[in-house]
Structures are given as C-alpha cells and as structure tokens.
C-alpha cells in the first residue's frame, strides 16, 4: 500500500501533460475562430498547427499568431492551416486576447522562427506539459486522417 501511495502523485502529475489525439478525433478550427492568413499566397507556403489534448488549459482557447498578428483561436484536438508568404515567419502562441474569462488572464508567450519556402508545408503542434506549460513545436509526424 505504501508503494502505491508513493507512486500515485507521479501518476496524477503525468495525467496533466497533453497527448496527441488520433487523427479521427482532430477537427478543423471553426471559421469564426480563424482570423487571418486564409487567402492564397502566390509563391507562398503553408503552416499547419494542431493542438494536443490534455487537462492543463483544456477548457481554454489559445491564440496562434503569425508575424505577431492574431491568426486563430484554437481549442483542444483542433487543427488550422495558414497560407503565408515565403521567407522567415514568426509563429507564436499566446493567451487568447479575445477571452475575458480567467483563461485570458494568464501569461503565455512562445515563438518560433519558421523559414517558409515557396510551395512548402510545415507542421507544428501545441503541447501542454506539467513543468514547461504550453509550447509550440515542429511536428515531424503529423496525424494523418
């Protein structure tokens, strides 16, 4: 029994980290929460972002920015794509500035520089971890429908 009680906190903490949903459980971000970068870009590329599932921040949207401009508000197990000009883009993750509940009062600011080549598609995913909080990372194995 003592061994069980010593392991229980570790199991509970591990349950808070996010996990990748199966492809059939991922849905597109609804159009009313996709705010920018939907027009085709001549000689541009595409950035595709999906968000993992998990308890931490699970009831909140987070904001995705492209070149520090609000581009979408994404929930758990959702995916969104952006058509962006070629060149170096700044892909960011912040609190949702349109949310006036407790979800919008935290602190979150993660950015990654992305070199976009004409015609390219790059994949990223949003994770939430016990120690590091939210992060946006390149995704070399995106879920395939």
Predicted regions and their residues:
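Sec-dependent bacterial lipoprotein signal peptides
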Residues: 1-18
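Short loop/turn and low-complexity linker motifs enriched in small/turn-promoting residues
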Residues: 16-145
């Amino acid at each position: 029994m003592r061994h069980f009680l010593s392991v229980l906190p570790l199991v509970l903490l591990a349950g808070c980290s996010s996990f990748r949903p199966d492809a059939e459980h991922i849905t597109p971000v609804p159009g009313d929460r996709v705010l920018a970068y939907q027009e085709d870009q001549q000689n541009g590329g595409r950035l595709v972002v999906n968000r993992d599932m998990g308890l931490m921040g699970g009831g909140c949207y987070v904001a995705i920015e492209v070149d520090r401009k609000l581009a979408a508000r994404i929930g758990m197990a959702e995916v969104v794509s952006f058509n962006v000009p070629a060149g170096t883009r700044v892909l960011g993750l912040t609190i949702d500035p349109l949310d006036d509940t407790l979800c919008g009062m935290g602190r979150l600011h993660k950015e990654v520089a992305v070199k976009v080549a004409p015609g390219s598609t790059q994949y990223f995913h949003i994770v939430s971890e016990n120690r590091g909080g939210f992060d946006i990372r390149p995704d070399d194995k995106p879920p395939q429908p």
